[in-house]
């Protein structure tokens, strides 16, 4: 049966990538269908009940700046908020929020259920309609064909998913859900490179069986921060509660090492590579054998939930071993496990087979986003879903495209890393992956991206107005401060000197004075003659950062300008690299396989030398591809 409602975009999968994808194309105005195997699991947090963290928080802020739903949802559902690295510079500060799982899912559903241009249908997808190497729709398990101009696959860990607990394995996309084996087989029949990855989750513990009195208490920040640029004054956080910290010990490690042969990871049952930066407890004990203990964050799953998430204890050991090592940990001596931990192995597709828009190079109008591309984490998935669906929507009746770059966002860093380098292990975002960290801060994500969001129609009118007002206030106040002078031996100077190490000897602007480490905006406000009445903390923060880091920011902007021309030099998709004399066989093979879209992208492919890029540039200039 063909169910033709004239859809522009079909999104397959209702996880974090799928939700952002479906919401984005619908906001742009594309008629969108979200296909999910179970409507009740839309927006479900399959693993840890948290959003954000180092690098990840930056992605959430950028998704929010583009009108996405993740930040607003966690503001509605967060039960503990913290700014990580708060004592360090603004480039590496990151927001992290503990979530109430049920409230988060409720918030996500509230946001997408009220989204115009979006339909939701429950059925798993078994096949794609592909004609002349172009996707035209999807076929469900019950035999319904949905036709559309674009298809975005956001299928998470469901492709050929296999769950492992010790030496017991069973098919599953996650605990309690069937895998998408038919769709996995269909995708394997297409000309994509495919491999296996592994991730895992810890056992869940009944909080009533835990002794919190012997653990360290970890409170959230006060005042409680917001994740979304648009939430303050509109969304009220739920009640805030603490998390706790405990540690493994020598007994824990002995139990684990004595039973390594029973672990699915170490017995050879699992072929896929696990996440380097979120290893199982077995991996930690083996790889860091010199460590006497490992930190465990004991995280509540919700305000009214009795389940705890022991972050740091992901495992594929048998259930009885899980019980033993859990009860060896301080505070967990009488712990009751409500759900066993497990590892899950699944198919992923080499992201080097994608364009920067996340459209596949081999099948036109088909986009991949999320764990199918080898990433790990809700935030990385959401970011990809956003970009994939933006491009699906804006290219329906034209050849338009938009994708972020390494110079304007962490989303750009994420996508560029994936499509140029690929990945052999689940990819996680860190601030260290970005060259321009001082410019790509959490606090200015809206200033970097919301102009484009307005242009694409991704922001609501209310959010657009909020952004424009904030941006104008920053511009106007910085201009005013650059044009307001204080001379020495004036009353203003005398009032100011109580904050300075030494007396003023020359005339300075307020902006230059703000560059001094001992001066901040609040001190300038104490000089009544200046009439500085600004009360918006977000605007003040941008003014202070612009002043105090002006030299570094200017330097990074110059670096970006130097590389911008190079980045924008497009390489035709049908470019014949064999015509370029002097390229080695290795370089020729890599360029031909990956088909980079720009010279900048080509330069970041592992094994492509500066000399090869020079030869390519010279040839492209000589033949008229570059002017």
Curated annotation (Swiss-Prot):
Instruction: Give one GO molecular function term.
Output: flavin adenine dinucleotide binding
Q: What's the cofactor?
A: FAD
Q: Where along the chain is NAD(+) bound?
A: 274-288
* A Pfam cross-reference name: GIDA_C_1st
Gene3D superfamilies to which the protein is assigned, alphabetical: FAD/NAD(P)-binding domain, GidA associated domain, C-terminal subdomain, tRNA uridine 5-carboxymethylaminomethyl modification enzyme MnmG/GidA
GO CC terms, sorted: cytosol
The disulfide bonds in this chain are none
Q: Which UniProt keywords apply?
A: Cytoplasm, FAD, Flavoprotein, NAD, tRNA processing
Q: Which residues bind FAD?
A: 13-18, 125, 180, 371
GO terms (BP aspect): tRNA methylation; tRNA wobble uridine modification
InterPro entries membership: FAD/NAD-bd_sf, GIDA_C_N, MnmG, MnmG-rel, MnmG-rel_CS, MnmG_C, MnmG_C_subdom, MnmG_C_subdom_sf
Main subcellular localisation: cytoplasm
Entry's localization field = Cytoplasm
Biological role stated in the UniProt entry? NAD-binding protein involved in the addition of a carboxymethylaminomethyl (cmnm) group at the wobble position (U34) of certain tRNAs, forming tRNA-cmnm(5)s(2)U34.
Q: Which family does it belong to?
A: Belongs to the MnmG family.
| Subunit | Homodimer. Heterotetramer of two MnmE and two MnmG subunits.
NCBIfam families linked to this entry:
mnmG_gidA (TIGR00136)
Q: Which HAMAP family match?
A: MnmG_GidA
- What is the protein name stated in its UniProt record? tRNA uridine 5-carboxymethylaminomethyl modification enzyme MnmG
Query: Which organism's genome codes for this protein?
Result: Francisella tularensis subsp. tularensis (strain SCHU S4 / Schu 4)
């Amino acid at each position: 049966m063909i169910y033709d409602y004239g859809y522009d975009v079909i999104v397959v999968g209702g996880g974090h990538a799928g939700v952002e994808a479906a919401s984005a194309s619908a906001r742009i105005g594309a008629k969108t269908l979200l296909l999910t195997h179970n409507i009740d699991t839309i927006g479900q947090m399959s693993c840890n009940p948290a959003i954000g963290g180092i690098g990840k928080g930056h992605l959430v802020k950028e998704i929010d700046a583009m009108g996405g739903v993740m930040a607003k949802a966690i503001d509605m559902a967060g039960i503990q908020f913290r700014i990580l690295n708060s004592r360090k510079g603004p480039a590496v500060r990151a927001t992290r929020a503990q979530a109430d799982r049920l409230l988060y899912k409720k918030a996500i559903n509230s946001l997408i259920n009220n989204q115009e241009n979006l339909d939701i249908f429950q059925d798993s997808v078994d096949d794609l309609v592909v004609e002349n190497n172009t996707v035209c729709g999807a076929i469900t398990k019950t035999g319904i064909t949905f036709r559309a101009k674009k298809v975005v696959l956001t299928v998470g860990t469901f492709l050929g998913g296999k769950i492992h607990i010790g030496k017991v394995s069973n098919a599953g996309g996650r605990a309690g859900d069937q895998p998408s084996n038919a769709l996995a087989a269909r995708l394997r029949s297409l000309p994509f490179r495919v491999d296996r990855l592994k991730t895992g989750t810890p056992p869940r513990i009944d909080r009533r069986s835990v002794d919190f009195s012997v653990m360290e208490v970890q409170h959230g920040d006060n005042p409680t921060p917001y994740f979304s640029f648009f939430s303050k004054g509109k969304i009220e956080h739920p009640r805030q509660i603490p998390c706790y910290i405990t540690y493994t010990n020598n007994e824990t490690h002995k139990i684990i090492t004595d039973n390594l042969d029973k672990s699915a990871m170490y017995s050879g049952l699992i072929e896929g590579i696990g996440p380097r930066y979120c290893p199982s407890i077995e991996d930690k004990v083996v790889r860091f054998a010199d460590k006497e203990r490992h930190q465990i964050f004991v995280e509540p799953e919700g305000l009214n939930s009795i389940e705890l998430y022991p972050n740091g204890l992901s495992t594929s050991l048998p259930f009885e071993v899980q019980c033993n090592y859990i009860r060896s940990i301080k505070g967990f001596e009488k712990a009751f496990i409500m759900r066993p931990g497990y590892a899950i192995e699944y198919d992923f597709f080499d992201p080097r087979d994608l364009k920067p828009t996340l459209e596949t190079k081999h099948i036109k109008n088909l986009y991949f986003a999320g764990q199918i591309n080898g990433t790990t984490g809700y935030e990385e998935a959401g970011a990809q879903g956003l970009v994939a669906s933006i491009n699906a929507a804006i290219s329906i009746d034209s050849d338009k495209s938009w994708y972020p770059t390494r110079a304007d966002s962490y989303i750009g860093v994420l996508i560029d890393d994936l499509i140029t380098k690929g990945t052999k292990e689940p990819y996680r975002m860190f601030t260290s992956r970005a060259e321009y960290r001082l410019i790509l801060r959490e606090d200015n994500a809206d200033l970097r991206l919301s102009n484009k969001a307005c242009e694409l129609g991704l922001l609501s009118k209310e959010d657009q107005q909020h952004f424009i007002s904030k941006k104008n206030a920053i511009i106007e106040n910085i201009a005013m401060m650059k044009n307001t002078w204080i001379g020495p031996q004036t009353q203003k100077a005398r009032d100011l000197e109580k904050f300075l190490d030494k007396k003023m000897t020359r005339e300075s602007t307020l902006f230059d004075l703000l560059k001094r480490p001992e001066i901040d905006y609040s001190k300038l406000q104490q000089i009544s003659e200046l009439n500085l009445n600004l009360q918006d903390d977000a605007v003040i923060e941008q003014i202070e950062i612009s002043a105090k880091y002006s030299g570094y920011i200017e330097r990074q902007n110059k670096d970006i300008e130097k590389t911008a021309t190079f980045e924008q030099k497009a390489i035709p998709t049908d470019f014949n690299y064999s015509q370029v004399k002097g390229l080695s066989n290795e370089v020729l093979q890599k360029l031909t396989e990956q088909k980079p879209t720009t010279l900048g992208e080509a330069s970041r492919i592992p094994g492509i030398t500066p000399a090869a890029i020079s030869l390519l540039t010279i040839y492209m200039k000589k033949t008229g591809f570059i002017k």
